Amino acid sequence: MENRWQVMIVWQVDRMKIRTWNSLVKHHMYVSKKAQGWFYRHHYESRHSRVSSEVHIPLGEARLVVRTYWGLHTGEKDWHLGHGVSIEWRLKRYSTQVDPDLADHLIHLHYFDCFSESAIRRAILGQIVRPRCEYQAGHNKVGSLQYLALKALVTPTRAKPPLPSVKKLTEDRWNKPQKTRGHRGSRTLNRH
């Protein structure tokens, strides 16, 4: 029997972001109770030696599995120390990988109070408008002019601590181009 390879997308991340993600998930599972039904699996409960944690998030019949890894091959740069995240959507026996934006949007649809597009219609009809969205990471588009005006009128309050965002977990602060300064501090190099 020959070896068969299975390829999956693993987002390379900083280990401190993984620690922050895990603590936010646990806080909202056990303290604030906003993550009802979420399941956290520790590294010692996994059969795979590279898995450091798993978070199972029910989405109706389906579920989202956010798996963090350690001990992977290091990246091109010295600071890529072999930590990563994979995001998988599962429904019965079917599974596919999703990107962090879609994962945040799916979580937003199923959990957390939202101040959304329907707020415009409710405000025009004179109904009570919920003044905040608890999960801003789930909004990935620019709102309409009426929505932006209503949002400016009703200032949202910030949830402390913030809700766990898959996009925040996977964003890489090192891959942004550095701004270097030329002679006397003028921005002449790497101007994009």
From Swiss-Prot:
Family label: Belongs to the primate lentivirus group Vif protein family.
Keyword match Ubl conjugation: yes
Motif HCCH motif location, chain numbering: 108-139
Region (Interaction with host APOBEC3G): 40-44
Ranges where the record places region Interaction with host APOBEC3F: 14-17, 74-79
Site label Cleavage in virion (by viral protease), positions: 150-151
Subunit structure: Homomultimer; in vitro and presumably in vivo. Interacts with viral RNA and Pr55Gag precursor; these interactions mediate Vif incorporation into the virion. Interacts with the viral reverse transcriptase. Forms cullin-5-RING E3 ubiquitin-protein ligase complex (ECS complex) by interacting with host CUL5, RBX2, elongin BC complex (ELOB and ELOC) and CBFB/CBF-beta. Within the ECS complex, Vif interacts directly with host CUL5, ELOC and APOBEC (APOBEC3F and APOBEC3G) substrates.
Coiled coil: none
Extra remark beyond the main annotation: Vif-defective viruses show catastrophic failure in reverse transcription due to APOBEC-induced mutations that initiate a DNA base repair pathway and compromise the structural integrity of the ssDNA. In the absence of Vif, the virion is morphologically abnormal. HIV-1 lineages are divided in three main groups, M (for Major), O (for Outlier), and N (for New, or Non-M, Non-O). The vast majority of strains found worldwide belong to the group M. Group O seems to be endemic to and largely confined to Cameroon and neighboring countries in West Central Africa, where these viruses represent a small minority of HIV-1 strains. The group N is represented by a limited number of isolates from Cameroonian persons. The group M is further subdivided in 9 clades or subtypes (A to D, F to H, J and K).
GO MF: metal ion binding; RNA binding
Induction details: Expressed late during infection in a Rev-dependent manner.
Organism: Human immunodeficiency virus type 1 group M subtype A (isolate U455)
UniProt comment concerning the protein's domains: The BC-like-box motif mediates the interaction with elongin BC complex.
Annotated positions of the Phosphoserine modification: 144, 165
Pfam short name (any one): Vif
Region (RNA-binding): 75-114
Region (SOCS box-like): 151-180
Name assigned to this protein: Virion infectivity factor
One GO cellular component term noted in the UniProt record for this chain: virion component
Organism taxonomic ancestry: Viruses, Riboviria, Pararnavirae, Artverviricota, Revtraviricetes
Motif (BC-box-like motif): 144-153
Region annotation (Multimerization) ranges: 151-164
Annotated positions of the Phosphothreonine modification: 96, 155, 188
